[in-house]
């Protein structure tokens, strides 16, 4: 069973840019605008299959010794931890000799565990995202989210 925890999707549009496009003044309800920006960002990520704003992601995968497993979010910037996950929820860092990681040319992340004695699941921590902030999101995507 695969589970991905990455928290709320950060807005992939700058609030000032959205206000200007929508012709909404500074007196408009900030909470409503923030909610709309978060919603459109999440929809854009689901539609494109791309993580727009860089963030840390924690993913749980089954142990499959010797098999490469793809991570669920892309583009992957870095894989920072591979841990064995015990039934009680505690994690233990696996020795680097017991696993391999790879980020391919398409920025898909991969993990292969050779040994995970006593663990039925893995917790992988990694960073994924196209841009550090909204200004780095490609123009075409930003335009699409505004429309």
Predicted regions and their residues:
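Divalent metal-cofactor coordination and adjacent catalytic microenvironments
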Residues: 1-147
